[in-house]
Amino acid sequence: MARVKRGVTSHAKHKKVLKAVKGQWGRRKSTIRVAKQAMEKAMQYAYRDRRTKKREFKSLWIQRINAGVRSEGITYSKFINGLTKCGIKLDRKILAEIAYDSPEAFKTIVQKAQSALN
């Protein structure tokens, strides 16, 4: 039976790990064992924070909408209720963008939502 040598594959795996931890500090960037642990932990953080990012952006959008709406004298929840009643189907991302970039247009949307509530 032929002898199996795995030098090429293990070298490739090690290069892949070291490339992933490039920019780390100390032995995390040079020693395979420590670098592998650092890479796995970084991947865990990345996985977790890809989900956290969605929550954080949604809360940011809500804060921006709420700030714009309260300047018009209405609460966020009443504004969203008014939007659904008058049939305006804009998501929070777009509403926050409008409130941030063009307050005049946002003011008209708020007035339509208020008229739907009355």
UniProtKB/Swiss-Prot annotation:
Looking at the UniProt record for this protein, which Gene Ontology cellular component terms does it annotate, in alphabetical order?
Answer: ribonucleoprotein complex; ribosome
Q: Which domain of life is it from?
A: Bacteria
Would the keyword RNA-binding turn up in this protein's UniProt record? Answer: yes
Keyword terms: Ribonucleoprotein, Ribosomal protein, RNA-binding, rRNA-binding
UniProt cross-references to PROSITE patterns, sorted A to Z: RIBOSOMAL_L20 (PS00937)
Q: What does the record give under GO molecular function?
A: rRNA binding; structural constituent of ribosome
Example GO biological process: ribosomal large subunit assembly
Coiled coil segments of this chain: none
Entries under NCBIfam families matching the protein: rplT_bact
PANTHER family to which the protein is assigned, alphabetical: 39S RIBOSOMAL PROTEIN L20
Q: What does this protein do?
A: Binds directly to 23S ribosomal RNA and is necessary for the in vitro assembly process of the 50S ribosomal subunit. It is not involved in the protein synthesizing functions of that subunit.
Give the protein's recorded name.
Answer: Large ribosomal subunit protein bL20
**Organism field:** Pelagibacter ubique (strain HTCC1062)
Q: Which lineage do the record's taxonomy fields give for this organism?
A: Bacteria, Pseudomonadati, Pseudomonadota, Alphaproteobacteria, Candidatus Pelagibacterales
* Gene this chain is encoded by: rplT
